[in-house]
Amino acid sequence: MGFFSYLGLVLVGLASLTSLASLANLQDFSTDNPLEEELRCWCQYVKNCRFCWACQDGFCKNKVLKNMPSVQEHSYPMEHCMIHRQCKYVRDGPIFQVECMMQTCDAIHLLNA
């Protein structure tokens, strides 16, 4: 086996490891239970996502935006981006982008159809 063939195999192996590491890094940005230090970023821009709210006795307070008034649980301002109560985040370079698959009003429309 020539030097360049061996080098090619090594590079393919490294590329595979890099892609696995990238997948592991994406799992760090979980939408189910984000890290406390990530909440400021997510909740600033995604005020409708469940993990941004602390609810008790039917009223919810935003965990990060302390000056935001409490809202009634399950009301429109508090509802989640997706009908399955999750938001999907896509890392696009240094920018995190939120993709909400189905807005609450669309979900209600489908349920009433």
Curated annotation (Swiss-Prot):
Function of the protein: Plays a role in virus cell tropism, and may be required for efficient virus replication in macrophages.
Keywords assigned: Early protein, Signal
Stretch forming the signal peptide: 1-31
This protein's name: Protein MGF 110-2L
Induction, as annotated: Expressed in the early phase of the viral replicative cycle.
Similarity comment text for this entry: Belongs to the asfivirus MGF 110 family.
InterPro entries xrefs: ASFV_fam_110
Organism of derivation: African swine fever virus (isolate Pig/Kenya/KEN-50/1950)
